[in-house]
């Protein structure tokens, strides 16, 4: 991922081109059902899992790089449709998103923002930058805002993060851990990456994994307090909140 590359110590035999997403999905199901007969080799050859809660593969489709997700054994059958709807809602709310689409059988796919043709875009997660655990709650959004200011020197990037935070709060995306926020380096300038992994979810004990002004179950007051903690203009914060609220109204159940 990002601009880093690596090669396995041992040579992996190429299993050939597999263009049928359904075949890959069936191999995922075999692994989840503990039938490993050949499944791991097929998935590794197609890019393997890129981490996260759901099985994923990295695919090249029409010379474009995509990440395609498959349901885990505990996901609802329409999880792909749900995440796709979230991605459309996020765009409507003014959040920078990569291109997304539903592949056959409702598998959710996202265009990789760390690739521009053959060019690799250097990408670093908040987890890596701040040495913050993504397995356990380790951050507050205030710390993310401060990191954005320190890295980019641009208060507008804080506004982008604040908008994403509001979306996460309003749409109950509580698995907002430290690896779900990244920064990209282009032309020697850092900026917040497009948003990803936006979907209805629970964090530890049902709370936000990244707290909002110290609260895992935030109120509006907590939301604006987080902005105040880093000197982000309250007027602008309220404008963003209202824009996201209106963008989600009637599409996704609001949670504040």
Which role fits each region the language model picked out?
Residues 1-256:
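Phosphate/dinucleotide-binding and metal-coordinating scaffold of catalytic cores
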